[in-house]
Swiss-Prot record:
Compartments, as annotated in UniProt: Cell membrane
Subunit structure: NDH-1 is composed of 14 different subunits. Subunits NuoA, H, J, K, L, M, N constitute the membrane sector of the complex.
Organism: Herpetosiphon aurantiacus (strain ATCC 23779 / DSM 785 / 114-95)
Major subcellular location class: membrane
HAMAP family: NDH1_NuoN_1
Positions of transmembrane segments: 11-31, 52-72, 106-126, 141-161, 193-213, 248-268, 296-316, 329-349, 357-377, 385-405, 429-449, 462-484, 500-520
Catalysed conversion reaction: a quinone + NADH + 5 H(+)(in) = a quinol + NAD(+) + 4 H(+)(out)
EC number annotated for this UniProt entry: 7.1.1.-
Keyword set, alphabetical order: Cell membrane, Membrane, NAD, Quinone, Translocase, Transmembrane, Transmembrane helix, Transport, Ubiquinone
Annotated protein name in UniProt: NADH-quinone oxidoreductase subunit N 2
Amino acid sequence: MNFQIADFTRLIPEFLLLAIAAMVLLGDVLTRWSKGKEALNDRTEEAISMTLMGLGLAFVMVLIQGGFFSWMQFGDWKFYDFSIFQNLRSSGLDGSILGGAFVVDPLTHIGRLVFIGAAFVTVILTSKAKPSNNPAEFYALILFATLGMIFMTAGGELIMIYLGIELTSIPLYVLAGYFRRNPVSTEAGAKYYIFGALSSAILLFGMSLLLGLTLMNGQTMTTTPTSLRSVATAVELAFANPEGPSQGVAILALLFILAGMAYKVAIVPFHAWSPDVYQGAPTSMTAFISTASKTAGFFLLYRVLVTGFGAPSILGTAAIGTSTSFGGWTSLIAILAALTMLVGNLAALPQTNAKRMLAYSSIAQAGFLMLGLVGTQRDSGISLLMYLIAYTVTNLSAFGILALVEDAVGGTDFSNLNGLGRRAPGLALLLTVAILSLAGIPPLSGFFVKFYVFIAAWQEGAKWLVIFAVSNTVISLYYYLRFLKAVYFAPAETDEPIKVGFGPGIVMTAITLLIFGLGIVPTWLYGVLEQATIRIAAQ
């Protein structure tokens, strides 16, 4: 793995996140000698400010580096023009650096923006429910997890992918159980760690099989044996010779990798950890885990499946871009998608806790997301990426508002939401928009991305799955509407107004406007996502 000077400039956002995390920790060390509650508050505010500043700077750097800004000439003046229709080219034709281990392509830029944005919102949400001790470690862990998610999305070879998964997972295990005086939070962290460690072991075993497959097929002569390109060549050779043992190894490796990743994104039957962890973790961290972490998992799954296992000979179908590609492992994805939608929706129906219900809702949403993986056509990839972005924004809004309600009333049961429409009309309106978007009600983003993913899956030939998904959408309306019943029609124990801080209120309002924007004018995102799918299909 060769590191060149040009690679440094392409990794500036990652170096920024690492530097800010180090500065947050160092700054806390220099002020830790101060005692008392006031000194702790000062340390926390400093950590929050530095983290937000670093995330904001990294976000702007990604915009500039990704080609979202371009110089425009106006007479004798030059100025920056914000343009998201640029063809993102920041790392050459093949988009890979560090010997192909890190891929800088449109998908990486999109992932950077999504993860950094989600981390920024999460830090804002924690500004009221601050950690009671060691604040610097808390916010540094958020930065490290964000960095790991970027590595997951940009990983072009198996070792980098695994390092990204662990760099994401380990900080999240700690953050889920960070409030040690709360036994529910501690239990959530322990369960998350146990299930996560098991999934990492399963995933690592699948990767070891892929490494053996590439070595078995002699792929070390021209490329790194752990690169996804080597994996793709070795798997294609294995399927070209069905009489040999290589095909069985390739299938077994794929099954282990799917199982390991299914744990990470809570796909049935590997979903059991999700409700307990989501309910027990601090609500602000639940928002981060359920959105950014799951999105990173799906980004990784998309890259690995399309790049490593997307050859027509593996699918047993026509070439990409010429006909449907529904077959082979995509049939397994379709079955898992159907099970995930059904189990998630049915389990959500009897829930009395809003966080736990949204946890099962997130499982069902993972099933809908998997419709974008039932084929390798370009439209399937675009619909998946659009759904992921809309899901991240919407779920972040829903859990974020629950975090604000919990700070005010001390719980997240449906009884705690009773009368919210009278106690905090603005907050109730924002929650309503998020819930209706999750339910797929037009003109919100949730409706349009579901429509796109249904159309793409139908074109791939998975007609039965689309019909099943539409039926599950109808089922989900029941438990989503329970939110509105509690917010607007259930009597509250008190009519005391709920006050929300200026910062969290502005951020939640901005996210709600984005939910509308992605729904009313979804085409503005299409061009960037199209470039992402083109580059991945070409790798």
